[in-house]
Curated annotation (Swiss-Prot):
InterPro entries noted in UniProt: Peptide_deformylase (IPR023635), Peptide_deformylase_sf (IPR036821)
Catalytic site: 131
Keywords of the record: Hydrolase, Iron, Metal-binding, Protein biosynthesis
EC assignment: 3.5.1.88
Disulfide bonds: none
Superkingdom assignment: Bacteria
Protein name: Peptide deformylase
Cofactor binding annotation: Binds 1 Fe(2+) ion.
Length: 155
């Protein structure tokens, strides 16, 4: 496995709609493995393939409930609204308040090509929406209010 450099704000791939994955092969499996390793190395809770320069509809998320991998994810339903602070590995040091659905259902494929349906609420729902936005070329700062620099805590 490998840790990839995370693409940052200003790279045009972050503004493009990622391409559907027509077939799951060894390259996609390797991509999933490398994305997870990159996400954990960066201490993130989610990563979309465009964030490592790959235009594929692939995401990985781990909000402390275990690794969730999704290929070609689609949000099929949303309910409620919550506003909370978000940041992004591609926009280091910046946070903002984003309103998102509080409960969602997402359909996609797992690494074996089997259908996967996830019902998520709270932080997992927020992380999934954030990563799926990346697949559509949308950055959190486009939806955020009260955008601010993250001030490091002093020890």
């Amino acid at each position: 496995m490998a840790v990839y450099k995370i693409v940052e704000l200003g790279d045009r791939i972050l503004k493009e709609r990622a391409k559907e994955v027509p077939k799951i092969n060894q390259n996609i499996i390797k991509l999933l493995d490398n994305m997870a390793e990159t996400m954990y190395h960066a201490r993130g809770v989610g990563l979309a393939a465009p964030q490592i320069g790959v235009s594929k509809r692939v995401i990985v998320v781990d909000v402390g409930e275990g690794l969730l991998e999704m290929i070609n994810p689609v949000i099929t339903s949303c309910a409620g609204h919550e506003t909370d602070s978000e940041g992004c590995l591609s926009i280091p040091g910046i946070v903002g308040d984003v309103t998102r659905a509080s409960v969602i259902e997402v359909k996609g494929l797992d690494r074996r090509g089997k259908p996967l349906e996830v019902k998520a609420k709270g932080y997992l729902a927020r992380a999934l929406q954030h990563e799926i936005d990346h697949l559509d070329g949308i950055l959190f700062i486009e939806k955020a209010k009260n955008i601010r620099k993250l001030v490091p805590k002093e020890d």
